[in-house]
Amino acid sequence: MAVTQAVLPSFSNFCTNSENMKFEKGFLDLDSKDLHQSPASYKPSQFLTDEHQDDSEGCWDMEFLLSDWASMSPERSNSQNYTPQRPTLQDQLHSPDLYQELNAPKPNRHQVCVASSLAELLPPEATLSSSLPPDLQFNCGFLDQQAAKSYSQAENPQQFSAFPVTSNVNRDSSMGKMGKSWDFGHYYQPAPLISFPDSKFVQTQGITMETVVFPPHHHYNFIPSYSHPRLYQQQANYVHRPPPQSHFPSTQSMVPDSTVPPAGLESKRIRRGLVKRKATVHSCEYPGCQKTYTKSSHLKAHLRTHTGEKPYHCTWDGCGWKFARSDELTRHFRKHTGQKPYECLLCHRAFSRSDHLALHMKRHV
């Protein structure tokens, strides 16, 4: 208060000298009776006469208020350039002597904004529109909107996660801590949320993508009998399952596998032949005889030699030969008939037995 009294004299000195009061053009008295009239009925002379009627109301010395701010340039009107010796504007505006008349209720709402002339010189944080009554703020549309925007941003500085709103005074300190990362476009993002099928959200702070367990993907079975498999190419992760095995033998087992090379087939055939030969080998069971035959008929004929049985008899008249084998009987019968079916191609000689022709062919060689 001592500093305020040293800077601002009492208002009684301002109001007694009406000659020192200066009014801007277009200033209207708050108690003027002609405000209810139409705008066309006003005259410039009425403004001057109505302004000098009420000398008891509080008034401002505009020259004195503007004298402190006239030496300051608009560039130095920011809040961060205040000098510590000069009293702050907040102490000047909230002094009880200054607002004893402004806080009084006014019957008329049509008032002119006095702070419009000081808005260009005063900093935006200390404009008069933030301290005036609602009636004065109604007329100060543009200044109130600008102040409201700045105050609304200051009330919720954490509204934006990327760039918090700070004042000009704290900008240097805040930029030193967090502003270096903003120059490169890096900022802290809130932890994202992952939704699960049970409509619950889990915050992923401290959880990496490797630890998150996702629900299993659905696999689609391929339809083998479908004639257009291209329609299923857009699906993902096909799983081809073999058909169920039935108890009955299928025809697919009889078809040789196409993936096996031909060499493998030949080896299989050779092995199968060896197995068959080993399985069809017939050996003589007579003691001391080790002969083997691939046919059972041949083995029977061999056993007849051991037993002496001769079941085949010659039917030629006067001949009673008997034979143990049928081929022996046929050769014997050709002697009676004189038939020689085997003939040499080189010398045209005929033979009744095939083995005799084979011996003859060796002579020509």
UniProtKB/Swiss-Prot annotation:
**Where found in the cell?**
Cytoplasm, Cytosol; Nucleus
GO biological-process terms attached to the record = animal organ regeneration; cardiac muscle cell differentiation; cardiac muscle cell proliferation; cell dedifferentiation; positive regulation of gene expression; primitive erythrocyte differentiation; regulation of primitive erythrocyte differentiation; regulation of transcription by RNA polymerase II
Gene disruption phenotype:
Morpholino knockdown causes significant reduction in expression of embryonic alpha globin e1 hbae1.1 in 22 hpf (hours post fertilization) and 36 hpf embryos.
Q: Does the keyword Cell membrane apply?
A: no
Q: Does the keyword Nucleus apply?
A: yes
Start-end of C2H2-type zinc fingers: 282-306, 312-336, 342-364
Predominant cellular place of this UniProt entry's protein: cytoplasm
Q: Where is the composition biased (Polar residues)?
A: 247-256
Question: Which tissues show it?
Answer: Expressed in cardiomyocytes.
- What parts of the sequence cross the membrane? none
CC terms in the record's Gene Ontology section: chromatin; cytosol; nucleus
Q: Name one GO molecular function term.
A: RNA polymerase II cis-regulatory region sequence-specific DNA binding
Q: What induces it?
A: In adult heart myocardium upon injury. Repressed in embryos by microRNA miR-144.
List cystine links.
none
> Entry's CDD domains?
KLF1_N (cd21581)
Entry-linked SMART domains: ZnF_C2H2
Identify the keywords attached in UniProt to this record, alphabetized.
Activator, Cytoplasm, DNA-binding, Metal-binding, Nucleus, Repeat, Repressor, Transcription, Transcription regulation, Zinc, Zinc-finger
**Which InterPro entries does this UniProt record tie to the protein?**
Znf_C2H2_sf, Znf_C2H2_type
Q: Which family does it belong to?
A: Belongs to the krueppel C2H2-type zinc-finger protein family.
- UniProt-recorded name of the protein: Kruppel-like factor 1
Q: What is the lineage of its organism?
A: Eukaryota, Metazoa, Chordata, Craniata, Vertebrata
Q: What gene name is given for the protein in this entry?
A: klf1
